[in-house]
């Protein structure tokens, strides 16, 4: 969607997001960022809204895009991504590959390993944003997003 101003354009963006049907289940954040860099010629503020779970490295694409545009990363995630609930056997499915498996969430060792993976992943993600000079915010789906966004925008001013 090309950048424009006005209420009508905002409603179009919302409609496009609601009606969007992905052509593929796989994620390639780097490809989306490269498209932004090539397609939008004039400098703009681009909001990158994602869970940022991607097997591919997109740091270079993000750095290049942020030199040309003002990129703001907004990570949205469910709290259970950070801390698995203790509910016994849980069937999990990789949304991209369709691979399913059962994990025993009653095991403290399993929950700790997952939590450690999440913390490491978040540290790597923050490192990517810092080295790319991209402002970012992480928002849980069960949190009030307004205060998080207000803090981000206050920091940017």
Regions found by a protein language model. Name each.
Residues 45-51:
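Acidic beta-strand-to-loop metal/phosphate-binding motif
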Residues 9-44, 56, 78:
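Von Willebrand factor
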Residues 38-42, 54, 60-157:
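Von Willebrand factor type A / integrin I
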Residues 1-11:
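A short alpha->loop->secondary-structure connector
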Residues 4, 19, 23, 112, ...:
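Charge-dense, low-complexity intrinsically disordered segments
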